[in-house]
Design a protein with these regions (language model features):
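Glycine-rich hexapeptide-repeat left-handed beta-helix
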Residues: 26, 35-38, 43-96
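Extended, small-residue-rich solenoid/repeat segments and analogous flexible loops
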Residues: 1-27
Length: 96
């Protein structure tokens, strides 16, 4: 959690690892064994389910829900309300 900000009401469960200079916003849920890289922003109400890997400099929008055990690459943007069921490569914008 070095130099990271965890906002009011965010929940970070067992064995989750948060990189440097991240923002974990209000009412976000980071489940067990999640790894979040450096310089990431997890927006309000996002749910990152167990064993997900989030690359460096990635933005996860408000209300995003991820399936367990997926990987999100570096420098990616996941837009508001997306439901991620598969891996996302680096440098990708996911928007419906």
């Amino acid at each position: 959690f070095r130099s990271s900000i965890v906002m009011h009401g965010a929940i970070i469960n067992a064995n989750a690892k948060i990189g440097k200079n991240c923002i974990i916003n209000n009412r976000s849920l980071i489940e067990h064994d999640v790894v979040i890289g450096d310089h990431c922003h997890i927006a309000t109400g996002a749910i990152i389910n167990g064993e997900v890997s989030v690359g460096n400099e990635t933005f996860i929008g408000s209300g995003v829900v991820t399936k367990q055990c997926i990987s999100i690459g570096n420098n990616s943007i996941i837009s508001v309300g997306e439901i991620l069921k598969t891996d996302v490569d680096s440098n990708i914008v996911v928007i419906s």
